[in-house]
Regions:
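Conserved SAM-binding loop and adjacent beta-strand
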Residues: 35-54
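Conserved SAM/SAH cofactor-binding pocket of Class I
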Residues: 48-132
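N-terminal auxiliary segments of SAM/dcSAM-dependent transferases
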Residues: 1-27, 37-42
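A short glycine-rich, Lys/Arg-flanked "PGG" loop and its adjoining helix->strand segment in the class I
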Residues: 144-156
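Conserved beta-strand signature within the Rossmann-like core of class I S-adenosyl-L-methionine
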Residues: 157-164
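Core SAM-dependent methyltransferase catalytic element
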Residues: 189-202
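Conserved class I S-adenosyl-L-methionine
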Residues: 165-182
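Short beta->alpha hinge that forms the Motif I/post-I loop of the SAM-binding pocket
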Residues: 92-95, 142, 165
Length: 202
């Protein structure tokens, strides 16, 4: 039975829990992560996430970093392991995802991760970088609201790195972000995905 895509973006997924272990293999890391039904990528780390982690620049060594829409935490845990002097926020509306991200960070000895729902992130907090495999399947309007809630919280000179499948609108999203006043660059294109670098226009 397939799980509706919207399940991933609800606070409490209705689908029953069925935990499983998935592997995240990168050149510098090899991790076993706990995933579950009702959380994005539950059958294995999503290809877009892998493209982002392999192609985006390394995270800043210090400061606050956000994994927006963290799922069970593959991006957040990787960022934390790559930048042990930084503090990584793993943010998601899905409470099951947040619990998994917290557990996976602990298992990976990434004590510099805080897994949280959006309302648990301090309002005045600003980020040195944002990394995200954003939930494009929620639809344009909810996606645009999500990005406009968080991208303005970048510090001056900081960047967000978004991975979006080309056939799911990476180029139209880049154009829309530019219309909102952001500076957008297509950083990489690989395996049907684009990595976008988004900065506040100077």
């Amino acid at each position: 039975m397939s799980i509706p895509k919207t399940q991933y973006f609800e606070a409490r997924p209705e689908v029953g829990s069925r935990p499983r272990t998935v592997r995240l293999h990168l050149a510098d890391l090899d991790l076993q992560l706990q995933a579950d039904r009702g959380v994005f990528g539950s059958k294995g780390v999503d290809l877009g996430t892998l493209v982002l982690l392999r192609e985006a620049p390394l995270p800043p060594a210090e400061g606050e970093i956000l994994d927006l829409g963290c799922g069970y935490g593959p991006i957040a845990v990787t960022l934390a392991r790559r930048a042990p002097g930084a503090h990584v926020w793993a943010g998601d509306v899905n409470e099951r995802a947040v619990e998994l991200a917290r557990a996976n960070a602990a298992a990976a000895e990434a004590s510099n991760v805080t897994a949280a729902t959006p309302d648990q992130v301090p309002v005045g907090l600003r980020f040195e970088a944002i990394y995200s495999n954003p939930p494009v399947r929620v639809g344009k309007a909810p996606l645009h609201r999500l990005l406009m809630d968080w991208l303005p919280r970048l510090k001056p000179g900081a960047a967000a790195y978004l991975v979006v499948q080309r056939n799911l609108g990476s180029d139209s999203l880049a154009a829309w972000l530019a219309e909102q006043g952001f500076s957008v660059a297509r950083l990489r294109s690989k395996k049907g995905y684009r990595v976008l670098e988004v900065r506040a226009a100077s």
